[in-house]
Amino acid sequence: MKMVVMVRTDINMGKGKIAAQVAHAAVSLVLDCMSRSSWRDWLDSWLHEGQPKVVVKVSSLEDLLSRVDKARSQGLPTTVISDAGRTQVEPGTVTCAGIGPGPDDLIDKITGDLKLL
C-alpha cells in the first residue's frame, strides 16, 4: 500500500509551498478514505504499514489530470489540490494531486514512470 502525490513542475513554487500542497493532498486523501467504506480497508492497511508516501514530478496540468482520471477509473482514492492564491500562485491554480492509499501495483501502473521530486 502507498500514497503518491504528483507535483506540477511547470509552475513556480518554493519548497515550503510544495511541502504545504503535498500535505494538503495527503490529509485530503486520508479524510476521503475515512468517510468511504470501500476504501477503509486500504486505509487501515496503509496505516499499519507505516503510511508510505511518494512524491513525484509531473510536467503539466494535462498530464496530472489524465493520471487522476486513470486512477479514478481504477476505483482508487484521488484528490486534486487547487491553491487559494494568497502567496505564490494565482487563485485556483492546481498545484498537485494525490492517489491512494491503495495497492502498489494499481498505483504503479499510473505513476510508475514519474521521477521523484
From Swiss-Prot:
Role this protein plays: The natural substrate for this enzyme may be peptidyl-tRNAs which drop off the ribosome during protein synthesis.
Organism encoding this protein: Metallosphaera sedula (strain ATCC 51363 / DSM 5348 / JCM 9185 / NBRC 15509 / TH2)
Main location: cytoplasm
SUPFAM superfamilies the record matches: Peptidyl-tRNA hydrolase II (SSF102462)
Reactions mediated catalytically: an N-acyl-L-alpha-aminoacyl-tRNA + H2O = an N-acyl-L-amino acid + a tRNA + H(+)
GO terms classed as biological process: translation
PANTHER family for this protein: PEPTIDYL-TRNA HYDROLASE 2, PEPTIDYL-TRNA HYDROLASE 2, MITOCHONDRIAL
Protein name stated in the entry: Peptidyl-tRNA hydrolase
Gene name of the encoded protein: pth
Keywords: Cytoplasm, Hydrolase
Statement: the UniProt record of this protein carries the keyword Hydrolase: yes
